[in-house]
Amino acid sequence: MRDYQKLDVWKKAHLFTLQVYKEILPIMPVEERFALTQQIRRATYSIPLNIVEGSGKNTDKDFASYLDNALGSTKEVEYAFILIRDLAYISLEVYDVVNKSVNEIKAMLIAFIKFLRNGNKGSTV
């Protein structure tokens, strides 16, 4: 088991979730409150939640499986933000900031999954 609060990928995912809650969700149109806004909310907090849940598992294999789920959620968030950009709910500038964060989290998750699946050989995360 790992202390998830010490994991850089969790820290980044947590800050991203806070950013989405504070800066993106409040500007979403009212008509999307029970549809797209809820889906973005769930997918966004699913990323750090899966990291947390996986960190409580006893094996690297199990932890990596939860990180796979977190990675899937990043892909879901990635598309949701393409959609709200194309619907003009957010500006291109806001999208670029969000997309950069999502890509950083994805890269961190992929590296961590590889690290766990390779038996922690020759790498430090």
Model-derived features with residue positions:
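Short, C-terminally biased terminal segments at protein or domain edges
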Residues: 1-125
